[in-house]
Each structure stands twice: as C-alpha cells, then as structure tokens.
C-alpha cells in the first residue's frame, strides 16, 4: 500500500511546474481537460516514487485571506531532502508570492527547516 497527498489549486499547470522545480519532481501521469488548460488529474514523482497528486480546484479558497491571516489548515511535510541547498531552493521557489511563516532555521528535530504558505494557498514544511 502507498499513500501520498493530492492538492486542489487554481492554475494547476503552473502549480505542477513549481512543484517540479522546488522538489526535483517529474510529471509521471497527467490528464488535462478538453481545452488542455488545466489538470483534471496529475501525478508527480521524485526519484521514481510517487510524491504528490494535484488537480484544478473547482471551488478555490480565497488565497489573499489565507495569506493575510496566515491560515494553516493542513501542512504538507517534505523531509529528508538531503541537503541545506535543497531546502534553500525549495524555500526560494515556494516563497515567491507566498507568505513565510518560519524562515529557514534549526529546531531540535531538524537542523534546517522552514514553513511557507505558497501563492496557491497550500502550507509547506520543508526540512533537510
């Protein structure tokens, strides 16, 4: 049995590209709408392992509200990223247009981590 998360966002094509950039992921399956403008379903993998699925949100939340109030309803944890450089790269990509809740710092359980609500409203905790 395997398990990974799926996010529903507006601008799903752009979001998938950001995830690929931030985490070194690749699109392994994709199903677009008839107009070829959004993902009905898209699966991403990192090093051959399923990482995340995404689809276009039919009823998106108000991202400006999420950012203004730093609203965390759920956080996606990406850990064992391998290096501080990998964490810094993901932080740079995800923080563009987003809200940094915790900049890159150390905690007792992680020597290099950060928390960001990125521009599509999803909260990410990234860690070495």
Could you describe each region identified by the protein language model?
Residues 120:
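Active-site His/Glu-centered metal-binding helix of metallohydrolases
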